[in-house]
């Protein structure tokens, strides 16, 4: 867990997050191309000022500058895999970008000048991509349209991961540390006093006082309690991570995982799923960060 958390902390801009995602690659590429068309056409239209056409609208230049920052922001957010963190702010900026593009299109598209019409076409393309981005980043990760778009990137990443590890690695991985060893150690403190009253309660309390706050199970546990932990948990389901997740350091049961990572899941009920990684590490993972295969 510490190793995975360290890898998560070192994660920065990764071009694989864009190249491996067809949706991100297509929309970012189209927006960049549209911005170049609008920028070059605006320069040409500025030099072609006539008495009939009038001066080039200065408002369009502000839209060009604003869209350059918006496109760069989307690129950085997607490449750094931080959409879950900044999707609210990004949606707000995209909403303002749509309004600016609409006003600029209205002031350019009806002109008889060819350069202005070309600039208007570039702004139209940027507006179309902006609408798609607003729908994508404004939707919850569990939304079917967004999950469908993310599934293309996940399948591509899954194929490359299987080729790298020889294929079928998650199916043959074994759990070295069953998660019940940690769960039962925490639950025994609550389960022992409940069915036993009177003298047995004091005996159980005395047996727990010495090993309190130890990471390993207490030495006074009977063999019957260890037998409950021995049977391994089966993981009939498989899931893929939509986003990266860093485990809470205060909760030893959580596990960290990276985006597009394949996990094995034992139970899909509730908000937290019992999962197992390819390395054999087990723990609980938030269900809204995973998608079932």
Swiss-Prot record:
Subcellular localization, as worded in the UniProt entry: Cell membrane
Official protein name in the record: High osmolarity signaling protein SHO1
Organism ancestry: Eukaryota, Fungi, Dikarya, Ascomycota, Pezizomycotina
Keyword Transmembrane helix: yes
Transmembrane segments: 24-44, 59-79, 89-109, 118-138
Source species of the chain: Colletotrichum graminicola (strain M1.001 / M2 / FGSC 10212)
Gene that specifies this protein: SHO1
Domain SH3 intervals: 234-293
Topology feature Extracellular, residues: 45-58, 110-117
Gene3D superfamilies, A to Z: SH3 Domains
